Design a protein with these regions (language model features):
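N-terminal leader/targeting and assembly helices and adjacent pre-domain segments
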Residues: 1-241
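Acidic, glycine-rich two-metal-ion catalytic cores of nucleic acid-processing enzymes
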Residues: 245-311
Length: 311
């Protein structure tokens, strides 16, 4: 095989590896994220139906009616202590699972649950809540459950992707140079650093909970807007489905971005382990390739200067 042919072969192999990671991201989205968001959408729909069900004699309800306070005996029927206890038990399970998740992720999970518990405790102390507020609390509980599962599932997925990418790049490098040698298996702590310590100080965990906060606020605002406009149950349901679609699109972007990032980080770490000093940036040139990637295609960089997600 000539030098040009050999380079072409290895270039294709690198691009094939990138394509494999893209396919892995799509499989994860279909088998995991799509199912979770569909279930959350169903549960949120049920909460909206409960709100409208309080006024079953009407096709629509006003914002004034939705803001009517639940007091006295009806308020006492709400099992606030049970809901708070359930949240605390979930926090305890998260803490007991320490070792399966990084401390940073565990702290983020606990923080979100504690904030919701404090809010429910405040309603208990106040002794009253509106029909709308009650449904908003229940919807936030559903969303928190959704993003808890996202945190855990996405971490496990990225952990697996890093290890797979690292070993594949070590193998490819050894194949390229024509001999094998011993290499260090990445520790759990090293994998966590790769996943959580991005150059831009962002990571999947922080981004997910930003999504959760934004989505909860979005749902609250859209419920109020729909009620002010006197929308029917069907129109309100369509409004919330639309917002769920926006949230799912954000989740898809995150999975794809983090998959690309972790592939590049695993490749960099494998190159360093194998003593590679330089690498060539290769981009799949098609209609989806960004202008920045087009400009970097074919350029060479020192491995020690590599910044996954940037070059």
């Amino acid at each position: 095989m000539g030098k040009g042919q050999e380079k072409g072969y290895w270039d294709k192999r690198v691009l094939k590896d990138k394509a494999r990671d893209v396919n892995n991201a799509e499989k994860f989205l279909q088998k995991n994220q799509k199912v979770l968001y569909a279930q959350a959408a169903k549960e949120i729909q049920q909460e909206i139906e409960k709100l409208y069900g309080k006024f079953a004699d009407q096709q629509d309800i006003s914002i004034a009616e939705a803001r009517r306070l639940i007091r006295g005996a009806d308020f006492k029927k709400i099992d606030w202590q049970g809901m708070i206890r359930e949240s605390m038990e979930l926090r305890e399970k998260i803490r007991e699972g320490k070792g399966m998740l990084p401390e940073e992720v565990i702290e983020a999970l606990e923080k979100q649950h504690k904030e919701l518990e404090d809010r429910m405790a405040a309603y208990t102390k106040r002794g009253q809540i509106s029909y709308l507020e009650l449904r908003q609390v229940e919807i936030e509980r559903k969303l928190l459950d959704l993003y808890d599962k996202n945190q855990q599932n996405l971490y496990e997925y990225l952990h697996s992707e890093y290890e797979d990418g690292y070993y594949r790049q070590v193998y490819n490098t050894q194949q390229h140079v024509g001999f094998g040698y011993d290499f260090v298996k990445p520790s759990g702590e090293a994998v966590d650093r790769a996943i959580l310590n991005r150059y831009d100080r962002r990571n999947f965990s922080k981004t997910l909970y930003q999504h959760c906060d934004h989505f909860a606020k979005d749902i609250r605002e859209n419920l109020v807007v729909g009620l002010i406009r006197g929308e029917s149950l069907e129109r309100m349901a369509a409004r919330i489905r639309d917002r769920m679609g926006v949230a799912y699109s954000a989740a898809k972007r995150l999975v794809r971005t983090e998959t690309a990032y972790i592939y590049e980080q695993a490749t960099k770490d494998a190159y360093e382990e194998c003593g590679v000093e330089w690498y060539e940036f290769l981009a799949t040139l098609d209609g989806r390739t960004s202008e920045a990637c087009r400009e970097l295609d074919g350029k060479h960089f020192k491995v020690k200067d590599a910044m996954p997600g940037k070059n």
